Amino acid sequence: MKALAKLKAAPGLEMTDVPLPEVGHNDLLIKIVKTAICGTDIHIWNWDEWSQKTIPVPMHVGHEYVGVVAGMGSEVQGFKIGQRVSGEGHITCGYCRNCRAGRRHLCRNTTGVGVNREGAFAEYLVIPAFNAFPIPDDISDDLASIFDPFGNAVHTALSFNLVGEDVLITGAGPIGIMAVAIAKHVGARHVVITDVNDYRLELAKKMGATRAVNVAREDLKAVMQELHMSEGFDVGLEMSGNPQAFRQMLETMNHGGKVALLGIPPSNTAIDWNQVIFKGLEIKGIYGREMFETWYKMVALIQSGLDISPIITHHFKVDEFEQGFAAMLSGQSGKVILDWR
C-alpha cells in the first residue's frame, strides 16, 4: 500500500510502498479517507532534536485521520464493515493503575500512532478496536479528520468551568483557535487570544475571539482596560509553549485563577513564582484527550452548534503532500487536510 514515511534520518517525508498491516484478533483495519497534518508531523518533517530521539526510521507517520472499517479481528464487536471511524492515537497498556482506574489518558506506558508505531499517513491503518471511535452521520469527514487536535482543545478548554468567565488563550495555533470557539460556545464572557501571527489571529476572530491581540504591537493590559476588566483573567489556556507568553499569562491572571498548560515550554523556563503563590493560582498540565469522555464531548459540541470549520483552510490530494507541508510551514494556514481517495 501507499504510505508517507520517514525513510531516512533527515528532513522531509517520502511517498513509498509498504506492506499491508497485520490485523490482530482485537484490531480494526481502517481504510484511510482523509488525514490532517499536525504540528507533531512538522517536527518530524523538520527532523528536529525531539524527532531524532523519538521517531524510529523507517516508519510511516501521521495520527490525525478519518476512514472506514475495512476489516476486523475475530474478537471485535460493536463495529461493522464500511462504518466511518476516527480513533484515539494514544495506545494504552490497560494494566497500570491509571488505566485500571479509568484514567487511560494518564497511562505511563502510552505509545503513539505515527510516533512510536506505524501511523495513519497510509492507505490503511490498524489500531486496537478499543481506540476506534464511530463518527455520526451528521459530522463531516473534514471535521472527523481533525478530532485529535480538536480533542486537545476540548480537553484543555473544558478543564475548568468557563461560564461567565474571562479567558486568556496564549498561542493562536489551530488548537488555540479551536479553544476560542469552544470557550465562547460554552458561555465564557471575554475570550482574548494572543500571538504574533496576524493570519492566525484573523482566524481566531472568525472563530469568535472577543479580541485577538498581536503582542508585538498591542499591550495586553491596555486591552484588558478596554474590556473593562479590572481584576484579571479567571482562566488561562496556555497553548504556545512560549516562556514570555506564559509569564504574561501569570501576570494578568486574577487571584484564584486557573491555568491549563498544553504548550510545552523549554525545560529551563523561569517564571515569577510569586504570581502563582500569592495569587493562589491553580495550574494543571494537559496531555492528550480523556478516553473517551473528550470524544463524546467533541460530538456533543458539534451537534449542539459549535462551528470549527473555519480552522480548515487548505485541502490537497495526498500526492501533493509537499504543498500541504509547505502551507503548514509557512504559518499562513489553519489545518491542512490530505485526501487519500
Swiss-Prot record:
SUPFAM superfamilies from the UniProt entry: GroES-like (SSF50129), NAD(P)-binding Rossmann-fold domains (SSF51735)
Pfam families for the chain: ADH_N, ADH_zinc_N
Sites where the protein binds Zn(2+) 1: 38, 63-64
EC assignment: 1.1.1.103
Cofactors that this protein relies on: Zn(2+)
Enzyme class, broadest EC rank: oxidoreductase
Protein's recorded name: L-threonine 3-dehydrogenase
